[in-house]
Swiss-Prot record:
Name of the protein this chain belongs to: Putative arsenical pump-driving ATPase
Enzyme Commission numbers on file: 7.3.2.7
InterPro entries: Anion-transp_ATPase-like_dom, ArsA_HSP20-like, ATPase_ArsA/GET3, HSP20-like_chaperone, P-loop_NTPase
Reactions this protein catalyses: arsenite(in) + ATP + H2O = arsenite(out) + ADP + phosphate + H(+)
Keyword Cell membrane in record: no
Top class in the EC scheme: translocase
Keywords: Arsenical resistance, ATP-binding, Nucleotide-binding, Translocase
Gene Ontology terms, MF aspect: ATP binding; ATP hydrolysis activity; ATPase-coupled arsenite transmembrane transporter activity
Organism: Chlorobaculum tepidum (strain ATCC 49652 / DSM 12025 / NBRC 103806 / TLS)
Binding sites annotated in the UniProt record for ATP: G8, K9, G10, G11, V12, G13, K14, T15
Function: Anion-transporting ATPase. Catalyzes the extrusion of arsenite.
Amino acid sequence: MRILTFTGKGGVGKTSVSAATAVRLSEMGHRTLVLSTDPAHSLSDSFNIQLGAEPTKIKENLHAIEVNPYVDLKQNWHSVQKYYTRIFMAQGVSGVMADEMTILPGMEELFSLLRIKRYKSAGLYDALVLDTAPTGETLRLLSLPDTLSWGMKAVKNVNKYIVRPLSKPLSKMSDKIAYYIPPEDAIESVDQVFDELEDIREILTDNVKSTVRLVMNAEKMSIKETMRALTYLNLYGFKVDMVLVNKLLDAQENSGYLEKWKGIQQKYLGEIEEGFSPLPVKKLKMYDQEIVGVKSLEVFAHDIYGDTDPSGMMYDEPPIKFVRQGDVYEVQLKLMFANPVDIDVWVTGDELFVQIGNQRKIITLPVSLTGLEPGDAVFKDKWLHIPFDLEKQGQHHRTREYNKA
């Protein structure tokens, strides 16, 4: 299943672009689902059709859905929520407050992500278009698998080696202890969610099937936010294959009051094309009417893609590479707009940590690099190069063997 994720600053028109892309995919024979994770529910407005928490048919080959996070939360977390609510209420916390305390930050977005795996496994669709919330929320959404990975491992180990083996013996010792032992279905729910989250990470970072497309306007704030988004998306291993600049005024038409705005847009457009190169930049005009309903979206889709299949790969370069040159192994990350001063790199065990500001990526290293300290990272041509000298590792290994002898 081809997955296309659209994101951008609020108000740039990403929902219209997402909906138009889905319409064009369906016209080309792809069984398409467009899914909105934006709580604003703009997708219903775009199609001018009321959408619900399950896929609604728009036309042939096209369904749409607006995720209701509370429905998903109840389906996936009910047994866990019930257990913790009981514990909190035993400590004197009121029922409503106890319910709220069982929902961890990011849980609503997490269960929106889990739908992706389920739709992929069902095999009902050829293409999935994700219409996401504004950039900041999207980055939090897409980075959840990485952000929670360490905690997932810890909780799963606690469940496997402590909770499961001890729950039955301890529950038999006294009723008070038994009261605090989590039921089997709650433990299984936690394990299942964490397992699926690992699968989601693999699906979204599959650079053959899944890409992100950035929607922006030719305005300073929109450009800056899109630059940050591209940097962080690349950091987390998401391939970006296209930039769409929306709501451009006609540079040829004399528009009086808007003449100054046209000049501003043309100036920023040059900066966008230069700064985001070699990514393809698609320029989209400002329409003289609202883009609402399937007919309007069909016209918009043709302006975006023409006769091109939207499911095609518009730019094909992975954001993370492992390159070996002689005895030097390099981990390379494409970080187009990162400030080298803000980048921090370190290794713990078999994991490479790369941090930019408050965003952190954990990369599992090949076995041959485990325990080897990285050399000095170099930022060159929009790529961060992190070297590992295999010869030094060999010398270190030989020294250890000699000392043992």
